[in-house]
Amino acid sequence: MYGVIFHFLREYVIERHGGKATWDALLKAQGYKYKMYFPVQDYADEEIVNLVQTASKALNVPVPDVLEDFGSFVGPQLLTFYHMYVKDKNMKTFDVIEVAGGSIHDAIHQHNKNRKPPRLSAHREAPDVLMVHYQSHRKLCPVVRGIIRGLGEKFNEKFDIKETQCMYDGADECVMRVTKLL
């Protein structure tokens, strides 16, 4: 897992769930007295899975809900981190999601050929409907839903997100129909 995600997870826990003491408690539960995550380094997927599961138990919130809330937090953060791909100031949520599926994930893979970023693609079915396709061995579709919601909050847009197929139900990929609400 790309280190920037751990960085964002730390910021998420600190901002939304009790501050640095909560983050330190999560690390301690994983057997770390102190741990620093570097944005461009790779870490084992299991490490973030364990952190999220520990957070879920501590917060008494189901893992998918923690992941979706994390996604809503991280969506706007990703705009800042990958600002070079989102140069058009008139871009809105659908535009950003369309760009993310190509340029951003290509850039992640280009820096390290061993990285396995998710496959993400999106196309407009209508001006107010975006079809989002997500595939990853990590099965983090709740994060994708959250990112869409978080970007929507940033751009003052609201969406109805219907998952028409999901990897958790045996599908090869998750497909989300995202409808912009007026």
Regions found by a protein language model. Give the residues of each.
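Generic solvent-exposed, charged/amphipathic alpha-helical segments
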Residues: F6, R10, I14, G71, ...
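C-terminal non-catalytic interaction appendages of large macromolecular assemblies
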Residues: V129-L182
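Long amphipathic alpha-helical segments
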Residues: A21-L59
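Charged, compositionally biased N-terminal leader segments and the immediate start
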Residues: M1-Y34
